[in-house]
């Protein structure tokens, strides 16, 4: 079970035997964001594919999860058909056919450790440096990333800025500078409960359902705030992640989440 999921994209995934090679073919996307990451069995990601064409998959581990994200407009029911057509054009060809056997984890111990690491890791305020290729990530940072959000994209493909937890005791507001990204990237805010789960269908802000200022900046409201734009409902211990896909990393070095102000 993966915490801190999102509804920005449709996911498709397959666990494959990599020992006999594999290829992935991506069709033209007509400007829509589509990425495919290869998550190896030790949770490192050496390959992320965005360009149309046929790509060779390589892995240091015998098994890997090939995970595709396709940008979705959750405000448009008709968008499902366009996504289905695009997904049908993606081809994954795998030489091996061995089955992956999941270890028999002690789930009580696993969840307790995950929660402890999440508390420590979220104090950093960003998930930068928590995912990437073998040999590029500090082991402790990689462990934090695995606990906070399994399947994070590497820094060059996405940035994740996480908030602390807040009380469900009124209305909060924050003013955000325009998040820096390259096309076909985008940004979003997704809200979670204290344990990292999505608890409402209305828990996301992105370009399809929010109002932006002319310069791309925006105000967001959290909780019972009356008739305001960009308002997300809250529960006790609510928190959020600002995701930036295809980020401009040089501009993100100084980018931080704004102060959260309690206004009522």
What feature does the model see in each segment?
Residues 1-264:
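A compositional/structural signature for long, glycine/proline-rich flexible linkers
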